[in-house]
């Protein structure tokens, strides 16, 4: 069917582009300034690779407050939310620099 052919084409393009997903868990607290700097680089730079999407939740420096974030190229949002058990980050892109991303999000 046309839908299957289109999906096969999309999957082929993604594989050729080397799109990867990196998932991290962390308990390290993060300041809003630190998170903003990371998201600025993810959204506008290439220090971490060619990032297409990032989202996650991290504990802030304030007890009981967490930052939730979403990022696409040239745009990101940070908001506060309810605490969770552990911080989680998901980054999708090509040529991802895993070690640099782990370092940025406190997973050395």
Q: What function would you assign to each model-found segment?
A:
Residues 1-83, 94-108:
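C-terminal accessory "lid"/substrate-recognition subdomains
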Residues 87:
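Conserved nucleotide- and phosphate/pyrophosphate-binding catalytic cores
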Residues 91:
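Flexible loop/N-cap segments at domain edges
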């Amino acid at each position: 069917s046309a839908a299957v052919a289109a999906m096969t084409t999309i999957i082929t393009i993604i594989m050729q582009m080397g799109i990867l997903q990196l998932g991290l868990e962390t308990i390290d607290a993060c300041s809003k300034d630190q998170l903003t700097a990371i998201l600025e680089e993810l959204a506008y730079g290439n220090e971490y690779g060619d990032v297409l999407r990032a989202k996650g939740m991290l504990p802030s420096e304030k007890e009981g407050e967490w930052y939730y974030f979403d990022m696409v190229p040239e745009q990101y949002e940070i908001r506060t939310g309810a605490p969770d058990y552990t911080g989680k980050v998901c980054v999708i892109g090509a040529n991802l620099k895993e070690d640099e991303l782990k370092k940025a999000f406190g997973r050395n």
